[in-house]
From Swiss-Prot:
This is Cytochrome b. One of its GO terms (cellular component) is respiratory chain complex III. Signal peptide: none annotated. Pfam families: Cytochrom_B_C (PF00032), Cytochrome_B (PF00033). The gene is MT-CYB. GO terms for biological process: mitochondrial electron transport, ubiquinol to cytochrome c.
């Protein structure tokens, strides 16, 4: 009799995805972030579901309902801060996961990569809408500023913004629809994750050398299940430290003031995980130009596979490309810092230079370096 694990139509899908899956024997901890992202998503959906049971998406009561969750609901404060800081862990894992893909050439699996980029956009949209829901000052003004960017689109811009708002300003209609979409999108994301994995399992995982490892594969379970659990424990430790000791470390104090359309906060800025994109947006003095740069800062990932000029897949044996990669990372930290600083003399020019550098590294310097290295190798 065959094992139910291999014969049952449903169980055999799980088996071929998480148990008997052949995996390269040399993948490092940088390959842990996929499973961590899956767990982050599950955590966000669960905590979000329980928060939604007590939340009201009406401008008159939204802020108070969040206060009520924190004060009166059993362990409501844990749910709320797990959900808020879980988003931060989600984005840390997301950015490290993308960085891993860039470094080791995983983007050569184009279908998997492109679905990953779409997933990134979807998660960013979800996080943005979620930030609006508590209806604090930053929620309201963040929603106003970011939705207003669409008015830069020629001809249809203004109509588009008013259509999204459901009126002539960010109001009840906007909050209600943002809640609806914030609830819906994670399930769409979960479905897309399945497709992401489907395409990944067509090719199998990449590995740190960038050389096909078909000759040396090991079963996913127990080797990588136990390795993933270690990564999970580390992430949960970090998350719980954040939630139980520093729950408001990454938040904005302005969001503890109820939304007031008549009073603009001194510095409007998004959550930390959007600051790099916000800095790129602000570094261009033209509205439409800024919006385009903002979208392209993420969309540029789509064309990365086309810009691969090296003979080798991974950067493991390419010191020049490695230098550029870490310069890119430092540049992203710089942009994140600038995004949170006010629009004043030293910061403006730093932000502009960092933005130029960001696009130059990805689109010009990296392909050129790979070409040069290929010629050096040939010689």
């Amino acid at each position: 009799m065959t094992n139910i694990r291999k014969s049952h139509p449903l169980v055999k899908i799980i088996n071929s995805s998480f148990i008997d899956l052949p995996a390269p024997s040399n993948i490092s901890s940088w390959w842990n972030f996929g499973s961590l992202l899956g767990i982050c998503l599950a955590l966000q959906i669960l905590t979000g579901l329980f928060l939604a049971m007590h939340y009201t998406s009406d401008t008159a009561t939204a802020f108070n309902s969040v206060t009520h969750i924190c004060r009166d609901v059993n362990y409501g404060w844990v749910l709320r801060y797990l959900h808020a800081n879980g988003a931060s862990m989600f984005f840390i894992c997301l950015y490290l996961h993308v960085g891993r893909g860039l470094y080791y050439g995983s983007y050569m699996y184009t279908e998997t990569w492109n679905i990953g980029v779409i997933l990134l956009f979807a998660v960013m949209a979800t996080a943005f809408m979620g930030y609006v829901l508590p209806w604090g000052q930053m929620s309201f003004w963040g929603a106003t500023v970011i939705t207003n960017l669409l008015s830069a689109i020629p001809y249809i811009g203004t109509n588009l913004v008013e259509w999204i708002w459901g009126g002539f300003s960010v109001d009840k209609a906007t909050l209600t629809r943002f809640f609806a979409f914030h609830f819906l999108l994670p399930f769409i994301i979960a479905a897309m994750v399945m497709v992401h994995l489907l395409f990944l399992h067509e090719t199998g995982s990449n590995n740190p050398t960038g050389i096909p490892a078909n000759a040396d594969m090991i079963p996913f379970h127990p080797y990588y299940t136990i390795k993933d659990i270690l990564g999970l424990l580390l992430m949960i430790t970090a998350l719980l430290t954040l939630v139980l000791f520093f729950p408001d470390l990454l938040g904005d104090p302005d969001n503890y003031t109820p939304a007031n359309p008549l009073n603009t906060p001194p510095h409007i800025k998004p959550e930390w995980y959007f600051l790099f994109a916000y800095a790129i947006l602000r570094s261009i003095p033209n509205k439409l130009g800024g919006v385009l740069a903002l979208v392209l800062s993420i969309l540029i990932l789509i064309i990365v596979p086309l810009l691969h000029t090296s003979k080798q897949r991974s950067m493991t044996f390419r010191p020049l490309s490695q230098c550029l990669f870490w310069l890119l990372x430092a540049d992203l930290f710089t942009l994140t810092w600038i995004g949170g600083x006010p629009v004043e003399h030293p910061y403006i020019i730093i932000g502009q230079l960092a933005s130029i550098l960001y696009f130059s590294i990805i689109x010009i310097l990296m392909p050129l370096t790979s070409l040069v290295x290929x010629h050096l190798x040939x010689x």
